[in-house]
């Protein structure tokens, strides 16, 4: 928290320079020394005020004899009492108004031959009555009246400002549109290339599948021919499965083993009688 002076009518804060062009120093109230504290408060004009340990007085309220210097550092003497206080409160509002207000210089006196500044022409709808007052030698005021015809308003040029932003927008959108079109064409070419690769892979898969079925069919036919040459005892049963007009699958099975009848006939076990 920055330090500031608690004395009335004083607004010194930490970092300011004092009357001796040195930084203003701050000192706490002697709360533990009752008589000295009362002397401080009497000189300040605040006898009934009780300061806290966080409030200070700046060095501008002490005389040079209240300080002692050691190694270039200014210390407050133990018996020092502040005695420099301003009794009259400064008029802050007046100082602010004086600082904010600028001095107004009186207007220069008008000369007789000084031409009056011309004001911009104001279009009117009818004749204007102009009254000119000026000092003359005969009478104090002379009145001259004349009729003025209103000036025709100057033709204003057609506004072409809204067209300029539209043209600028069109010229700015041209490169962006061209870049987007090129990107679309590039993506279309990539898609066509991927589709061609996919179709080639599908044809290759179909070809490999057909070749594998033909190889199996050939092996089955070979086994069939070998079984026919070996004889009926070593013959095998074959199952031919047609998967297409040019594809056939032959499955070979071992010959069925001889089976025993599950219900054998009952033998005649009767013993002949004697």
Swiss-Prot record:
Region (Disordered): 83-121
Zinc finger (THAP-type): 1-85
Keyword DNA-binding: yes
Keywords: DNA-binding, Metal-binding, Zinc, Zinc-finger
Single Gene Ontology MF annotation: zinc ion binding
Pfam families xrefs: THAP
Keyword Nucleus: no
UniProt-recorded name of the protein: THAP domain-containing protein 8
Organism whose genome encodes this protein: Homo sapiens
Classification lineage: Eukaryota, Metazoa, Chordata, Craniata, Vertebrata
Gene, per the UniProt record: THAP8
